[in-house]
Amino acid sequence: LRQDPDIIVIGEIRDEESLDIALKASLTGHLVFSTLHTNDAISAITRMLDMKAKDYLIASALSLVIAQRLVRKLCEHCKRKSAKHYNEFEGDFYEAVGCELCKMNGYFGREMVSEFLFIDEEIAELIRTNAKTSEILSYARKKGFKTMFEVGLQRAREGKTSIDELLRVIK
């Protein structure tokens, strides 16, 4: 029985063989989704190189890398403006308090903070030429890339999560 799927989902890429299959499937016209354990989107490229993938295959096969984390959401009923001043961050922030609704936790539910690294021709060329992670990040920032921490900081400014929670999860 021959199969020719348009979309391939690989649960997790853990070894060189799985990575090679995923990259080659992508190059032959398949849309491939998978997971890879890294701290951020740009580190996924480094991880693939560490797994012996060829730079030109990565550059040609990748379209998008997403990194994400879940942060606890502040309870809407009991959160309060924080009296703490975070010298390195501008803005007003909120903190967890605790009430019956959130079972005295101060948090209720979770929210995703993520970063999206779109692989355009320039980033593909940076990958092919073994550019440093910092060079890729610098270029991506010029194109509007926001790190998970920056996205999380915005969520904290909006009162959706706390700085303490953000630092616990991301830093």
Tell where the protein language model's regions lie, with residue ranges.
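Short, flexible helix-loop junctions that flank or precede catalytic/ligand sites
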Residues: 1-171
